[in-house]
């Protein structure tokens, strides 16, 4: 479902914070800025339903009509992001409880237990009232369910959750004996005889059973997803043709977004990279991940900031031009919408110093609003991009349940974190402008030539066979250290590490050697010496050949990186955390073998992506440098700059510092 036929542009709008005369001023400013969509009513439950069962829509009717009269459509919030004070007073047991028994209070946001029965009842009534009220309004283009689910309270440990957890476990395991087997409860005498003996993994004297913890991640994810589906069912019934979504948060650990994405009509997400970090590589990685959740379907960036946030220790603004630059970088990786939090900067409340499209003081020379207007007017020229896709020959495996499991306590290296390992491999693709998708281990891999599996600690039943077939059919599988270790219940695969991946990789890992943070070792390969940190595997070859060996410590000379021929393909194992230079060279060698090339050869810190329709190819080029760069385009092509409309023959192209180009590619005859 496309929300609009053009690039969506706008932001969260909270008119309940402002007097009515400001609403008219806002609508005019939106029109001038090129805004065509706003998210409305997200935190308005207490305004829409000021007391139990009493609804007031008059103010919202007026706001929607004003916006529609000025050409602005609505992504209408279901207002369930924060329960009202009257609800909390009436149902104090709806407040969430942490693992130590501390009850969270009203006065912030997201202060509810997802398994409270009255919460669900009241949500159903509210959502149906909103849907019935606005189902026929021509301004309604999309539903915004709740807001940033689990952002502040991702787990509740109350009695409602305990009861629901036991029910969830019964449905999953059927018998208490099966649960005991899966959880390994004979260890430390944790065996259960009855379901009602099981509680959430609350604060305990020492390590919680990791299998129980892992299942509680799954349970809370499912509980919160059930809340979303409760709202979606009502909205789909009342407005079957209006897209339904909720805003994700990129690499947000508590929620399995691959699972969630199957239930939204379009992926939307919120992104707040820190300007102090320079090149926004993790922002790019998350854009690729969000695009991949629904197999390449374009997504909407639902929130970003024009300038600065308010919740870091030091909240620096984006320098001039960077907001525009990063917006185009998001479009380059598959976005069909660029939205902000929020439209008008709040006067009061916890986010009053969070940047906005309209700052506290606005005049015609204000940099923020000027950049907002420039971007909005430019995006009107890019309707041609809506619905276009990105084609990738490389995939990185990203698995939320694996993430949960690998970061549970009592591991060989308890400071090891999943995202930095994934990002280490992604960074080398980003620097080389190689398009990449993210996939699950069970996904169809036939379209890819190379699949990278960073720290695939958990391998579930059937996933190894999927990877085995990929390699046997000619693919290259690159697997990092600490992979193939456990099953879906965090039970070790017996028979030697890396468990079910041993035959693909042709190795046996005898021991782990986790490194202190300050330790640096070296690895040798046929093209030089490289640093390695964090981890070393003691590897015995079972058919594989060494590509690099360790230089130091008692395992000097043993393999660090290996390659194994399997079927028509190969399995490469990286048994340490090598530096960027080595990873880059390794990947370049693999890509050369598969004839995978950069989209364009460009200078450092120049980002290039290609979006395609059945008819056209579009190059989006982002110069993150603060100086001009020159790049070469194929001379047998003709290009049209979609921002200024000019056509030119390929050859030398200059792009100013902190600037972009969006080019449509033609051949000599003017066609693709």
Curated annotation (Swiss-Prot):
Pfam families registered for this protein in UniProt: Glyco_hydro_42, Glyco_hydro_42C, Glyco_hydro_42M
Enzyme class: hydrolase
GO molecular function, one term: metal ion binding
Family annotation (InterPro entries): Beta_galactosidase_C (IPR013739), Beta_galactosidase_Trimer (IPR013738), Class_I_gatase-like (IPR029062), Glyco_hydro_42 (IPR003476), Glyco_hydro_42_N (IPR013529), Glyco_hydro_b (IPR013780), Glycoside_hydrolase_SF (IPR017853)
Active-site feature positions: 148 (proton donor), 303 (nucleophile)
Keyword Nucleotide-binding: no
GO cellular component, one term: beta-galactosidase complex
The keyword Ribonucleoprotein is assigned to this record: no
Catalyzed reactions: Hydrolysis of terminal non-reducing beta-D-galactose residues in beta-D-galactosides
Residues noted as binding Zn(2+) in the record, renumbered to the chain: 113, 156, 158, 161
Domain of life: Bacteria
Keywords attached to this entry: Glycosidase, Hydrolase, Metal-binding, Zinc
Family: Belongs to the glycosyl hydrolase 42 family.
Protein name: Beta-galactosidase BgaB
Organism name: Geobacillus sp. (strain Y412MC61)
Lineage of producing organism: Bacteria, Bacillati, Bacillota, Bacilli, Bacillales
Gene: bgaB
